[in-house]
Amino acid sequence: MKLLVIAPCLITPFYVYRGPKEKEYIASIGVRGIISELDKEWQILSYPCPEFLLLRWPRPPMSKEVMAHLGMEKIVKDIADFIGRIITEEKPERIVFVGVKGSPTCGVFTTTSSNPEDYDYSSIQRFFYLGKEERLKSYKEIIEKGNLRIVKGSGLLFTELMERFSKLHNAQWIEIDKDNIKEGIESLREVIRETRR
């Protein structure tokens, strides 16, 4: 068996914190296209969305430090335990972990960072009640006010997953950039091809 461990927002666009924009629809269509091409040796593990478990949906943009301040670390450990149990019991010959560039939880090599003391925590409740159009108009303002920035490093979940599984000889790590979806889709497709050799 080969195992594809993938962020749920790459399969369905509706987990995206502010609600989907066109790029999320395109990304999920591309990823589902690759999944449809997998042979019977592959199994898909789309773990529970850690951000949804912590804050429900929708939520305003925030950094990994803000997520940690709100209690994300317990959820991350629970999800990593779940993934680890599957890996231990199923013993896949190949594991491909797929995350999302810039995500505070599922960023593989790139995440979002800020000082959690600068964050407007009251925006969480306000954002929840906004309609989609209002959310899409206001999320950039929250990014600016909170001084959220994209940095090198892993999101909270992928930091935990890498600590536990990066030494496995059969594990590979891919980060999908929703702003450059063609490159990410091609990287994933190439890794899948390599497993057939």
What spans do the regions from the language model cover?
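Short, well-ordered beta-to-alpha junction loops that form the rim of enzyme active sites
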Residues: 97-104, 178
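Residues lining hydrophobic/aromatic ligand-binding pockets adjacent to catalytic sites
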Residues: 2, 11-30, 46-48, 136-140, ...
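Short catalytic/ligand-binding loop motif for oxyanion handling, primarily in non-cytosolic enzymes
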Residues: 13-15, 54-56, 103-109, 113, ...
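Catalytic phosphate/metal-binding cores of nucleic-acid and nucleotide-processing enzymes, i.e., regions
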Residues: 115-117
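Short His-Asn-centered micro-motif
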Residues: 6-8, 100-101
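Short, surface-exposed acidic-centric catalytic microdomains
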Residues: 20-66
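Divalent-metal-activated hydrolytic enzyme cores
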Residues: 55-64, 69-87, 122-197
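Structural motif
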Residues: 3, 94-98
